[in-house]
Each structure stands twice: as C-alpha cells, then as structure tokens.
Amino acid sequence: MNNIRKLTDSLFWVGVNDRRIALFENVYPVPTGMSYNSYVLLDEKTALFDTVDASFTHDFLENVTAALNGRTLDYLIVNHMEPDHCASIANVIAAYPEAKIVCTAKAVGMMKQFFDFDVDSRAIPVKEGDTLSLGSHELTFVMAPMVHWPEVMVTYEKTEKILFSADAFGSFGAVDGNIFADEIDDKGTWLSEARRYYTNIVGKFGMSVQGLLKKAAGLEIRMICPLHSVIWREDLPWLIDKYLKWSSYTPEEKTVTIAYGSVYGHTEKAADILAGKLADRGIRHISVFDVSKTHPSYIIADAFRTSAMVFASITYNGGIFCNMDTLLHQLAAHGLTNRTAALIQNGTWAATTSKQMGEILGTMKNIHVLEADVTIKSALKNDQEAELDALADAIAASLQ
C-alpha cells in the first residue's frame, strides 16, 4: 500500500520516513529518525522532484506510481546528488525509461560517477534562470552551489509559487503524520532540531546560503518544500529570518553556552558555579554541556544560538581533554565566527589547556577570547571565588 500526501491539487508528497536510522550521515544522532522528501507535480507533463535513500526504494516507487495514477513520468528534477536523495535515480529510470533528467551540469558528472546507465542521453543540463513548462506550471531553476554540495540547485514553480529548496530549510526528524509545519504545536522542538541540522550539515557554507537567500528574496514564495522534514506554507518570514541569522553567524540570543570536560567532577563544579553566577547577573537561557555525554552536534547548534562560549577542560595526557578537543576542532570546521570565548583549565601538576584551547580558537574568525580566565589546580578553593566572579563579570559585560 502506498503512502502519499496531497499538498495541493497538483502536488503530492511521495517521500518516506526512516525511524530505524541511528546516525544521519553515520555521524549525527537522529533519535526521532529522518524523512527523505520527494514530490510529484501533475500537469500536461509530469515531474518528480528528487528521489530517496536506497533503503526505501521499493516503498518510494510505490508512492510515485500511486501519485502518477497510470500516467508516465516525463521529468525527473534532481536538485541534489547526495545519496540520501539520489540513490533511487537508476530505479526511477528503469521504471520510466522515457523520463528526462533535469539537473545542473555538475550533477550530470556526479550521476555518471554514481551510476552505470546512459546519463547523457537522458540529461537536460540547466543553468541559472532556465525554465521548463509542464503546462500551466512553469519551473525556474536557481543555482545554489555549496548549499551544501557544488551541484545543488533549487527549483521555483511560479504558478503556485512553490520553492523546492533541496537541503535548505530542512531538519532532522521523521514526519509524524502532520506534514505541514503549521500543524505542529511544538515549534520549539522543531527549531532545536532544524538549528542542529543547519549548523552541522550546512553551517560551514554561510556565504553560499546568503547568496541563495538573496535570490529567494526576489521570488514570491507561498510554500517551501525541503528534502527533509516538514513543509512550510505559513510563517515563511520567521523561517527565513532564522536562516538569515544562522548563515550570517549572528547569535539568536545574548547568552552563554558552557561546555566542560571533566573526569572526577572538579571542572564540572567550576562550570556549574560559573553558570549560577552568570544567572545571578541576569543572563537567561544559559546552556551547560558535558562533552563526554552530549554529542558535539548539539553543542555546535547551541553555540550558533548564543553569543558567548565557555570552554572548561582538564589537562589530559598533556593536552586538551579528548572530547573537548573534538568539539573545538568541530566548531572550527563548521565555520563558527563572531563570538566571545572564555576559558577554564584544570591540571594537578601542569595545567596547559587554556593555551592549547586558545590556539584552536585562534584559527577561527572573529573569536574574541577574554583575558580573564581561571586555572584550577586539582580542585577549586574558596579563595578562587573572586576569579570566577571576575570571569562572570567579563562574560556578562561582553553581552552588553
């Protein structure tokens, strides 16, 4: 039995949900699964927008067949060639051998690398501003390189004013029946996972996202259909504003992310005491993370949310605690910029981590490391409270 959803009189969702997956891209925890979205548009000609992960090809083709309702497929629009979206292309072509594939020139090259069928005889390479008429619906192709692969484009349907946005505006998480964002009561949970998705999957490519947003600003958009998660038909300015902030590395809130690496609890205590002192200074929505318990993707997402970060690490084998080292290098790799940072180090005989953490932060753009820091020798002493107060004062001042 098929599982398709009618979005408009002519547009159908034919995607799938994956609740068995534990790690997206074999890296990122997805406790609520993933959706792989695909869409069928019916007109005088028919079009399928992207495919799905290879694990779900059978169910996906059932959905496509049901949406086409006895018709053939004229066009396969390939916005993105990452395998969670392109893996079923060969199966679609086998089922609909007359279908033409519309994609960028770079996508043609990638398709030849992934598949063995004759791509050239089927491909229609498109460039910026090219159009394709399906009848009463006209598609315009908008190039979106490095959002987040080089071959990416998005497709705008101008009659119903729908943007097929590839990986942009997506989120972690399967679709739980309610396929439209306005059907979800808990937008806070969605936002948290959307932020984590953006910052970890697309976050490095902020300038490219900014370029796409500028192009999108010139389009009248009534619906956004991403390749992951829910579809947007309301609150589009709110959604786009989030992307404007994230892609420009602008903090959402003037508050603090605290991450600590601790073995026996002494550095953890320092992080907790500092968090309390920051709260006493009127700072709200502080986050505190144990880098050994919380996956880096959650901490990276929170660092994009906040304007200041505190890194508290023990000295471990003469260096930064291993999980803290991973977090710092991941933050650098994801391009986070325009933040204030503060450091706490702990070492029983040779505390070295403030210098080492500072060196990693120094490779990042516009990260201001506060001069006030705290060195713990094994355990905090009562006479160090003034140092924590000074650090809290400096952090609070940076938020003004």
Question: Where in the sequence are the language-model features?
Answer:
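Active-site metal-binding motif and surrounding structural segment of the metallo-beta-lactamase
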Residues: 44, 55-102
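Structural motif
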Residues: 45-47, 75, 137, 161-164, ...
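Metallo-beta-lactamase
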Residues: 5-9, 103-152, 211
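Active-site-proximal loop/helix segment associated with metal-binding centers of metalloenzymes
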Residues: 148-152, 168-203, 247-251
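Short N-terminal or domain-adjacent regulatory/targeting segments
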Residues: 225-252
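Active-site neighborhood of phospho(di)ester-bond hydrolases with catalytic His/Asp-centered motifs
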Residues: 49-51, 73-81, 101-104, 163-166, ...
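Conserved beta-strand hairpin/beta-sheet module of binuclear metal-dependent hydrolase folds
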Residues: 4-65, 154-157, 161-165, 267
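FMN-binding flavodoxin-like domain, especially the glycine-rich phosphate-binding loop
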Residues: 175, 186-224, 229-231, 273-289, ...
